[in-house]
Amino acid sequence: MKKIINAPENYVDEMLKGIYDAHGDQVKYVNGDLRCYCTAKKKDGKVAIITGGGTGHLPLFLGYVGEGLLDGCGVGGVFQSPSAEQIYNVSKEVEAGAGILYLYGNYTGDIMNFDMAAEMCEMDDIEPRSIVGADDVNSNANPDTRRGVAGIFFMYKCAGAKAAQGGTLDEVLAAAQKAKDNTRTVGFALTPCIIPEVGHPNFTL
């Protein structure tokens, strides 16, 4: 697979900087950290919705930060979770007095770091709630342990719309939960993945 990039080790940050340069009227990064994204304008009294995950599934995750969707996003390296501190910093930036809803995929690192960020928010008297996407029926027969991939978008949209209408944290969470409960996806690969910094396929087909 051919990739048009400069240095592989700079790929993620250069990509994020490019997106910011192209859409700086809609998004900004937090505390000078390119991997902490949020909307350019905060609406007081609105439930803040935050996601995050590893780079490599564009437009997930930062591509859905914007009006009527998400308020913020933590971005990790390729297939790496954002840190708890990054998620917390985004949370502090976008929190608007109505609580925070975390929506993210069912991956060990994401769960661990979002849980830690939630604990940090609670210490600041910010109320966090979480829903973990688990839509990919191809990854596991047990619904509780499935991956959360493409289907997470529907949680974004439903929760974002309810939050934009002025819904409470409970109402926004219920909208996201309904979307999760009614969404299934099937994930499959046609070619093996090549992580830029590794330079060769992760597996063979």
What are these regions (language model features)?
Residues 73-81, 122-148:
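Short, acidic/small-residue loops that bind anionic groups at enzyme active sites
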Residues 111-125:
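Short Gly/Thr/Asp-enriched flexible loops that form oxyanion-binding sites at enzyme active sites
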Residues 57, 64-97:
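Glycine-rich oxoanion-binding loops at beta->alpha junctions
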Residues 1-49, 200-202:
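N-terminal amphipathic/basic leader segments beginning at the initiator methionine
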Residues 44-52, 61-74, 137-139:
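Gly-rich Lys/Arg/Thr-decorated short loops/hinges at beta-loop-alpha junctions or inter-strand turns
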Residues 54-59, 105-114, 147-152:
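Gly/Ser/Thr-rich loops at beta-strand to alpha-helix junctions
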Residues 139-146, 156-205:
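Internal, active-site/partner-interface "lid" segment
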